[in-house]
Amino acid sequence: MKTKEKIVQESLSLFNENTFEQSTTNLIAKKSEVLEGSLWYHFNSKQDLVSVHTELFLDSFRKKRIYTEKNDPKELILGLLSIYEVLWDYRYLVRDSFEQFSNENPKLCEKIVDINHEIDEWAKEAIIHAKNVGVLIIQDEDIESVVEISLIIGRHWLDYSMKKYPSKSNLYLRKKGINLLIKTLYPYLSNESREMVDSIYESD
């Protein structure tokens, strides 16, 4: 792995685990096994790393969201759950406060706000589409609540779970989060979709 790629990867891991604010450049360099001068050679600031992470997030998010627009029930369901995986991988972007960027780097601050708005809009569109193709049997008045609960899990389970289960692995916490999302959607799944979800997770 190239030095720049390693710095991007290790900084993402640190920001997720420790928050952006508490991850110092010295810590990033140490975790990346490079001198701090090498870090500065590739990136002028931690904000530059956030900018790279936002691009990587959007690339993954937009590739996965295509599947949530499919009419095939299995592709749609797996697509919905795969978005959660992307949110987990870049969780600090939807968890941390970046108010300090509003003056220091307004363009980056606006980009993070736009990302969060895009996630909100996608969640509602995905639930409505799932209803329209028969994956979900849900009343219009319940859509907003299901969307909001799903977003709360997607955004805040990530941080809460690590505090509640500090000794558990990331894999365990990811799976538990997915199970919470399934439980949120399960009462609204069509019979066919329930059988599909049951078979997928029985095989796992």
Predicted feature residues:
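N-terminal positioning helix adjacent to the helix-turn-helix/winged-helix DNA-binding module
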Residues: 3-10, 146
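Helix-turn-helix
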Residues: 6, 14-52
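Short, basic, alpha-helical segments at the C-terminal edge of helix-turn-helix-like DNA-binding modules
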Residues: 55-61
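Hydrophobic alpha-helical connector segments
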Residues: 65-93, 110
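Secondary-structure edge/capping motif, primarily at the C-terminal ends of alpha-helices
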Residues: 65-68, 94-101, 130, 134, ...
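Amphipathic alpha-helical segments used for helix-helix packing
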Residues: 88-109, 124-128
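Amphipathic alpha-helical packing segments from all-alpha helical-bundle domains
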Residues: 106-133, 144-159, 176-187
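C-terminal peripheral helix-coil segments that are non-catalytic and often amphipathic
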Residues: 159, 163-204
